C-alpha cells in the first residue's frame, strides 16, 4: 500500500536498504522505516534482518544482537540469518563478537564451505577471535573460490610458517596445497596471471 510519501512498502524497504549505507544517520533513518514496516509484517525474515543491521549500524549493537539471537532461535542453521549476523558481529569488531560469529558459523562449514562470502565472514570472525590459523585457511579458501588459486596457494604456503599451526592443521594445509597446486600450474602454463599479485 502507498504511504503519504508516495512509495509502496517494497519501495520503502529498498530505500531503507540504500540509506542504511550512509553512515550512522542513514542507519538511524533506515531503522525507523524498517521498524514501521516490520510492525505490519512481523513474520517477514528479510525485514527483521535488515532492521537488525540498521540497529547495529545506528549504534544499538546490544539491541541488534538480541534481535539476531532471537532470529537464530527461530531459524536455526539459516544461512541468511547466520551470514547477516556474522557480518554485523564482524563490523562490531570486538574479540567477543568474533568468537560469537565463529561459533555460529562453524556448524555451517560443511554445507557452506564452497561459498566465498561465507569463507570471508568466517575468516574475519576467526581473525577477530584471535584464531590466526583458521583465519588464514578461510581467507585462502575465499581467494580460491573467488577465482584466485595462486593467491590461495601463497596464503597457504605462508600459513605453514605460522608457529600456531599444529600437526593436524599442517596436514590439512598440506592436503589443500596439494589439491590447489595443479590448478595453479595449469594457469601458469596457459599464461594466465593473477593481476593482484606482485611479480617483480
Predicted feature residues:
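Short coil turns that delineate tetratricopeptide repeat
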Residues: 42, 76, 112-113, 130, ...
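Single-residue signature of alpha-solenoid repeat helices
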Residues: 30, 64, 101, 135-136, ...
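Specific register positions within alpha-helical solenoid repeats of the TPR/Sel1-like families, i.e.
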Residues: 18-20, 56, 90-92, 127, ...
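Structural register within alpha-helical repeat arrays
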Residues: 15, 51, 85-89, 122-125, ...
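Extracytoplasmic and endomembrane cell-envelope/extracellular-matrix remodeling and assembly machinery
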Residues: 1-46, 50-67, 164-165, 175-178, ...
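Canonical positions in the second alpha-helix
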Residues: 36-37, 70-71, 107-108, 142, ...
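Alpha-helical linker/edge segments of TPR/alpha-solenoid repeat scaffolds
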Residues: 61-62, 93-98, 128-137, 165-169, ...
Amino acid at each position: 500500500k502507498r504511504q503519504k510519501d508516495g512509495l509502496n512498502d517494497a519501495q520503502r524497504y529498498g530505500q531503507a536498504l540504500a540509506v542504511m549505507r550512509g553512515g550512522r544517520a542513514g542507519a538511524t533513518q533506515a531503522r525507523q522505516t524498517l521498524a514501521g514496516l516490520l510492525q505490519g509484517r512481523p513474520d517477514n525474515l528479510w525485514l527483521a534482518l535488515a532492521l537488525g543491521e540498521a540497529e547495529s549500524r545506528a549504534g544499538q549493537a546490544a539491541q541488534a544482537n538480541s534481535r539476531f539471537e532471537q532470529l537464530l532461535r527461530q531459524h536455526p542453521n539459516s544461512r541468511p540469518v547466520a551470514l547477516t549476523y556474522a557480518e554485523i558481529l564482524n563490523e562490531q569488531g570486538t574479540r567477543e563478537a568474533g568468537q560469537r560469529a565463529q561459533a555460529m558459523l562453524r556448524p555451517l562449514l560443511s554445507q557452506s564451505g564452497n561459498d566465498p562470502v561465507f569463507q570471508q565472514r568466517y575468516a574475519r570472525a576467526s581473525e577477530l577471535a584471535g584464531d590466526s590459523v583458521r583465519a588464514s585457511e578461510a581467507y585462502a579458501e575465499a581467494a580460491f573460490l573467488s577465482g584466485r588459486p595462486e593467491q590461495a596457494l601463497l596464503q597457504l604456503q605462508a600459513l605453514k610458517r605460522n608457529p600456531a599451526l599444529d600437526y593436524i592443521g599442517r596436514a590439512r594445509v598440506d592436503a589443500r596445497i596439494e589439491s590447489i597446486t595443479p590448478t595453479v600450474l595449469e594457469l601458469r602454463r596457459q599464461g594466465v596471471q593473477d593481476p593482484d599479485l606482485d611479480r617483480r
